């Protein structure tokens, strides 16, 4: 990660706001902080927050870059605000947005998994149970069914994630049940509003490929559980839900077939 970007973020924030860089993607750099943007700086808090920063891209004209950064940051903020109001859908809470400078301040989700398995995204969560030689236990089954339900609720409300990998699903330990992990969808930088079954089919296919690439030995069962949860959301919505589900699964099969052909051809 570029030290220049880290220094820019620290200069933008107050010197009394500590930030720790945790990841860098193609579009943004992600930091954690213990300071809430609207509380006094000397207010002690045990909470953690996410700061997502879209840094300037030198290959773009500065005026175009500024416009794109503002548009994309504001778009993600608006999308998160809408998703947060959907009953039963788990996404991070938006705390603050500075679209002009490319900053989002978000609720921090997840935790460090035991035995050095890293941050509690779905990928690491499944690896942890695989290492325990218990990849098909009820905890994993329930988690994957609920992952499917989250995607189903997202799609039923005509939204798509756009980058639905197992790293962008965070498992949050339930406060009331030590064996229950609640999936939350994060990183909606490529998310959108859409009614197109193609977009939704691609969303599911991207997650399927992610699970196949990192958990190939158990992927068939994992994907089956995930799809069971996904289908259940649509099936609860009567004839219309069944009709939409049939259309979506048909398109998903077509997307999957195209992906396999592409893999064979190279």
UniProtKB/Swiss-Prot annotation:
| Gene3D superfamilies, sorted | Phosphorylase Kinase, domain 1 (3.30.200.20), Transferase(Phosphotransferase) domain 1 (1.10.510.10)
Q: Drop me one GO molecular function for this one.
A: protein serine kinase activity
Keyword Endoplasmic reticulum in annotation: no
Keywords, in A-Z order: Activator, ATP-binding, Chromosome, Cytoplasm, Hydrolase, Kinase, Nucleotide-binding, Nucleus, Phosphoprotein, Serine/threonine-protein kinase, Telomere, Transcription, Transcription regulation, Transferase, tRNA processing
Q: Which EC number(s) does UniProt give? A: 3.6.-.-, 2.7.11.1
- Quote the cellular component terms of the Gene Ontology held in the record: chromosome, telomeric region; cytosol; EKC/KEOPS complex; nucleus
Swiss-Prot/TrEMBL domain comment: This protein is considered an atypical serine/threonine kinase, because it lacks the conventional structural elements necessary for the substrate recognition as well as a lysine residue that in all other serine/threonine kinases participates in the catalytic event. BUD32 has protein kinase activity in vitro, but in the context of the EKC/KEOPS complex, the catalytic subunit KAE1 switches the activity of BUD32 from kinase into ATPase.
Please state what the protein is called.
EKC/KEOPS complex subunit BUD32
Q: Which organism is it from?
A: Candida glabrata (strain ATCC 2001 / BCRC 20586 / JCM 3761 / NBRC 0622 / NRRL Y-65 / CBS 138)
Give me the gene this protein comes from: BUD32
């Amino acid at each position: 990660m570029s030290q220049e970007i880290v220094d820019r973020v620290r200069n933008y924030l107050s010197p009394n706001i500590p930030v720790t860089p945790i990841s860098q993607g193609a579009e943004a750099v992600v930091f954690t902080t213990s300071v809430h943007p609207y509380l006094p700086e000397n207010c002690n808090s045990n909470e953690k927050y996410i700061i997502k920063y879209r840094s300037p891209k030198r290959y773009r004209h500065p005026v175009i870059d500024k416009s794109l950064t503002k548009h994309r940051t504001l778009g993600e903020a608006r999308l998160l605000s809408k998703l947060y109001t959907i009953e039963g859908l788990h996404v991070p809470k938006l705390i603050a947005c500075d679209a002009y400078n490319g900053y989002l301040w978000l609720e921090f989700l997840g935790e460090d998994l035991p035995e050095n398995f890293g941050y509690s995204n779905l990928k690491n969560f499944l690896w942890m149970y695989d290492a325990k030689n218990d990849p098909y236990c009820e905890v994993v089954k329930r988690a994957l069914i609920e992952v499917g339900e989250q995607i189903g609720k997202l799609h039923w409300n005509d939204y798509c994630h756009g980058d639905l990998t197992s790293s962008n699903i965070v498992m949050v330990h339930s406060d009331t049940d030590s064996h229950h992990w609640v999936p939350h969808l994060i990183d909606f930088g490529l998310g959108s509003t859409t009614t197109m079954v193609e977009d939704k089919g691609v969303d599911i296919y991207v997650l399927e490929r992610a699970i196949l690439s990192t958990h190939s030995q158990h992927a068939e069962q994992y994907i089956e559980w995930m799809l069971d949860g996904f289908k259940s959301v649509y099936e609860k919505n009567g004839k219309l839900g069944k009709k939409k589900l049939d259309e979506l699964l048909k398109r998903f099969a077509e997307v999957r077939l195209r992906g396999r052909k592409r893999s064979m051809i190279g």
